[in-house]
Design a protein with these regions (language model features):
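Haloarchaeal acidic low-complexity proteome signature biased toward cell-envelope/secretome components but also
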Residues: 1-60
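Early extracytoplasmic/lumenal segment of secretory-pathway proteins
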Residues: 54-133, 137-138
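A ligand-binding cleft/hinge motif common to bilobed small-molecule-binding domains
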Residues: 135-139, 268-289
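Extracytoplasmic ligand-binding site segments that recognize negatively charged/polar headgroups
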Residues: 82-89, 126-265
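Extracellular/periplasmic bilobal clamshell ligand-binding domains
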Residues: 357-397
Length: 397
């Protein structure tokens, strides 16, 4: 996350007062120095102790509780799609390395790219865990590419957003929104969008960017539009028709929109609430008052904001399982969950944390947000992505 020019968010309340509870014991010198913490795993890793010249940590939940040793940690930990510039992973990566001495590889991939790569390397895994869109992870599990591990605080995750076998666990959720350049809209006399139909107007469509559906964020956007026009998981023709109409008016389908947005080359984009809010309140590259984020309905009030879960799972036969388990525990701890919230990513443990006041009002989410049958989506996801891509004439489908 880019350091905010406006200072830290005003997150208050008892749930936010605790620091890292991980208890780290130094093995250097004649004595040992232990950081304070209850070792419960609710706000960091379990307590550490010294063994064979290195710290050890208690990790895992229930039957998966075990001890890992720093002596087994790698020089660098590889986890798919843990990357700077997305979901505030940069802050989590920095804090994890600072606390445990393990840097993470900056893995700049989408969920779809991660799934393709781990499938290609299934016989000789290069990464320790999959991270990304939850349903993409379920596909990896169904392919037999994951293994069981329930991180500490696994019991705090809603039942519908984790698998009983411990192969996939949700860590955060994001909702499809539209972000636009408020200043450009005002200068050009463009009325801000209220429904997805408004994004068809040529003055908006000609400078709008959508993510392709093979990325989790792009699939979420496609499902949002599809639902807004009466589609379903069994019928994606509405979004195909929509995309073809805006494409003819100049809309583009690509990733990495932020730089083009700040330069004004694109004045509207479809991603998540996190993307727009983090850009508005945390980025130094553009003034806060130039950015606006909104949730849209369909033309007749249909819900048009898909709520997308993201999560992770260990990979079968993956290298460095000890460090991976510690990292997975950290991500699900309150300390790690706060890092998501700092960038307006709603953590899976949000009920235990106070939400920043900069989020759109809850009433806006209630009017627009929807979910789907995630089991059905898993079964049909790849055919849905392919059908949309081919129907719109996007490359690579």
């Amino acid at each position: 996350m880019t350091p905010s020019r406006r200072g830290a968010l005003s997150l208050t309340g008892a749930a936010l007062t605790a620091g890292l509870a991980g208890c780290v014991t130094s093995s250097s010198g004649s004595g040992s120095e232990t950081a304070s913490g209850d070792g419960s795993g609710s706000d960091g890793s379990g307590g550490g102790s010294t063994a064979d010249g290195g710290e050890t940590y208690e990790v895992g939940h229930g039957d998966f509780q075990t001890t890992v040793s720093a002596s087994a940690f790698p020089e660098k930990l590889f986890v798919y799609a843990v990357q700077t510039g997305w979901s505030n992973w940069g802050a989590l990566m920095t804090e994890f390395e600072k606390t445990y001495g393990v840097p993470l590889n900056d893995d700049q991939r989408s969920s779809g790219e991660a799934l393709s790569d781990l499938r290609a390397n299934s016989q000789d895994p290069t990464h320790s865990a999959y991270n990304g869109g939850y349903t993409f992870g379920i596909l990896a599990m169904n392919d037999g590419l994951t293994q069981a591990y329930k991180p500490a605080d696994w019991d705090k995750v809603p039942e519908k957003l984790k698998t009983d076998n411990g192969h996939m666990t949700a860590t955060r959720r994001m909702t499809t929104t539209v972000t636009y350049r408020k200043d450009i809209y005002e200068e050009e006399g463009i009325e801000p969008p209220e429904t997805w139909e408004d994004l068809k107007r040529e003055e908006i469509a000609s400078k709008t960017q959508y993510q392709p559906p093979n990325a989790a964020v792009g699939l979420a956007g496609a499902l949002s539009i599809n639902n807004a026009y009466g589609g379903s998981l069994d019928d994606v023709q509405p979004v195909i028709d929509y995309y073809n109409e805006v494409k003819e008016k100049g809309a583009v389908f690509a990733g990495n929109v932020e730089q083009k947005f700040t330069k004004g080359e694109v004045h509207t984009f479809v991603e998540y609430d996190y993307t727009g809010l983090d850009l508005k309140y945390n980025a130094d590259s553009i003034a806060e008052d130039k950015v606006a984020t909104t949730l849209l309905t369909g033309p007749n009030g249909e819900k048009g904001a898909f709520n997308q879960p993201y999560g992770y799972g260990m990979l079968k036969g993956a290298p460095n399982p000890e460090a991976c388990k510690l990292f997975m525990d950290y991500v699900l701890s309150l300390e790690g969950q706060r890092k998501f919230l700092d960038a307006f990513v709603r953590p899976i443990r949000a009920p235990e944390l106070e939400m920043p006041e900069q989020f759109p009002p809850q009433s806006a989410y209630e009017e627009t947000e929807f979910q789907v049958d995630y089991g059905k989506l898993v079964d049909e996801q790849e055919s849905i992505i392919s059908e949309i891509g081919k129907g719109v004439g996007l490359t690579g489908y």
